[in-house]
Amino acid sequence: MPIITLPDGNKKKFDQPVTIMEVAESLGPGLAKAAIAGRVNGVLLDTCIPIEKDSEVNIITAKDQDGIETIRHSFAHLIGHAVKQLYPEAKMAIGPVIEDGFYYDIAYDQPFTPKDLEAIEARMKELVKLDYDVNVEIVSREEAHKEFEKRCEPYKIEIVDEIPENEIIKLYRHQEYTDMCRGPHVPNTRHLRTFKLMKVSGAYWRGDSNKTMLQRIYGTAWGSSKELKAYLKRLEEAEKRDHRRIAKQMSLFHTQEEAPGMIFWHAKGWAIYQVLEQYIRETLSLHAYQEIRTPQVVDRSLWEKSGHWEKFKDDMFTTTSENREYAIKPMNCPCHVQIFNQGLKSYRDLPIRLAEFGSCLRNEPSGSLHGLMRVRNFVQDDAHIFCTELQVQEEVSKFIDLVFEIYRSFGFDSVLIKLSTRPEKRVGSDEIWDKSEKALSDALDAKGLAWDLLPGEGAFYGPKIEFSLKDCLGRVWQCGTIQVDFSMPERLGASYVAEDSQRRTPVMLHRAILGSFERFIGILIEHYAGRMPVWLAPVQVAVMGITDRNAQTCQDVCKKLSALEYRTEVDLRNEKIGFKVREHTLQRVPFLIIIGDKEQQSGEVAVRTREGKDFGSMPLNSFISLLDEAIALKGRSGVS
């Protein structure tokens, strides 16, 4: 006779085992109709699963994030149902939930066309209208193998055969279509109303370029048509803000086939990069970091000692010379330990903070490369802090302050924080994990910050905090991190002399704020739609004359501003002033100076902004003061 405890603390007693749906029915027909799944003692389950003992139960509906995830997962299976009806020879692979949607990987001889996508979506809508029940059946591995063997589904068979023999498998049945999944899924297709298929792309089976190329159908699903429309609107805006598109308009950078995943920085894009780098350099110096530089090509033996060779060999670019094998560094940390290891260190020397703008290369799959957001060659704002166990909390606390200081400078006030704790497989004693996790959580709590706990999501060598930015479209970008490492310093022989004159291994804190310069610049371009804050703008001022008579004055003004290190360009083309103003506005130049005969005679300059605000005429020194004020605002000038 289970006693069910509800989220509000109320309890309900049942005379026999009860399903989640029956609990919902006991609370009212409206809730039962809306029920999609349930959490039983924190575990997300199908509504048909019986509850046999006292439990805490939360009914999940489309208003909950868990409900939306369940709906999206069910839509992935609905793709399978529709595709198998329309294209019986198709073979189904996998169909997981992703951010804002879902996809299904399918093997089919003919490429799916836009018309095929329309037909699949139409068939899905027809199936939804049937309001049929989605039934779940728990089977053994052998039974699942036979089921998919009967259906001639080789990809499903491959997955089934890799599942441990004693593990249960759930089969979900959509009428004549059967799929497998951990679940949960909606109990009836009446919950599957608001969706849209988005596109088709290629994807290798299991991400292995040596395996079959499949077709991936992407879709999105939401709890209401209003949410779907808002999402599609955001996508439309995101397309306008695509950093690759804006980079082409502004001549910031380009990529090309001869160097996949490598950036060709143009002068204007490189100007943004240099401002960013110098700002981080100066800020780190104020926070007592030492800037260092380490080799890019390092002997294989160091990567073997650090453990990277075993775990990341396939992601490394390697080369040989004089019968020695080298790797181009995919990360900086082992090299930073080498610098720490030079000379005897005392506890009095700690903490030591080593920072590097380290150029790294990783052999990312070509299909995953995406402008600045996913590259092979990137530069990290990387630093490593070597400290004692007792110093961890203080160093984390200082880093949190630094993170928020820098993010605010770029106009990001919404920062999401996650703390990842010990996984099952790990190094280090429970005692040191307890201390480290407490140090991280206490540092966050002392700042009064809200954060989410991710149990078991830490690396094997230590817990970590992740910092994610929310941009103007509500998209979340994970950028900053601080990671405790108990393993690498010991593996690479790092030590210091403690107060008791004994050798101790320091704790190593891996930390980054931007993540990589390339990706962060991509985020900034999209966040600001290319209209960078004045301090970051590749060209801060464009000077233009109305007639050829004003050319010399324009050049003089440009020289004066350039001498003061403002990024200035002069436009002396024989074009109408309206054309020039429009062109530099489209180039997102923050300030436009216009000089005609009137300004030339008065010694003043006419000033307007890219947003169209007209300041009228003013002395050049007054404009410089205006420019300085705008630069000092940094990211606080807002997003337009």
From Swiss-Prot:
One term of GO molecular function: metal ion binding
A Gene Ontology term for the protein's cellular component: cytosol
Annotated cofactor note: Binds 1 zinc ion per subunit.
Any single GO BP term: threonyl-tRNA aminoacylation
Principal localisation: cytoplasm
Catalysed reaction, written as an equation: tRNA(Thr) + L-threonine + ATP = L-threonyl-tRNA(Thr) + AMP + diphosphate + H(+)
Enzyme Commission number: 6.1.1.3
Domain of life of the native organism: Bacteria
InterPro entries, per the entry: aa-tRNA-synt_IIb (IPR002314), aa-tRNA-synth_II (IPR006195), aa-tRNA-synth_II/BPL/LPL (IPR045864), Anticodon-bd (IPR004154), Anticodon-bd_dom_sf (IPR036621), Beta-grasp_dom_sf (IPR012675), TGS (IPR004095), TGS-like (IPR012676)
Keywords: Aminoacyl-tRNA synthetase, ATP-binding, Cytoplasm, Ligase, Metal-binding, Nucleotide-binding, Protein biosynthesis, RNA-binding, tRNA-binding, Zinc
Subcellular location: Cytoplasm
Residues binding Zn(2+): C333, H384, H510
This protein's record includes keyword Ligase: yes
Pfam name, any one: tRNA-synt_2b
Domain TGS: start-end pairs: 1-61
Cofactor(s) this protein cannot do without: Zn(2+)
Region (Catalytic): 242-533
Subunit structure: Homodimer.
Function in brief: Catalyzes the attachment of threonine to tRNA(Thr) in a two-step reaction: L-threonine is first activated by ATP to form Thr-AMP and then transferred to the acceptor end of tRNA(Thr). Also edits incorrectly charged L-seryl-tRNA(Thr).
Family affiliation: Belongs to the class-II aminoacyl-tRNA synthetase family.
PANTHER family: THREONINE--TRNA LIGASE, CHLOROPLASTIC_MITOCHONDRIAL 2, THREONINE-TRNA LIGASE
Name of the molecule in the record: Threonine--tRNA ligase
Native organism: Prochlorococcus marinus (strain MIT 9303)
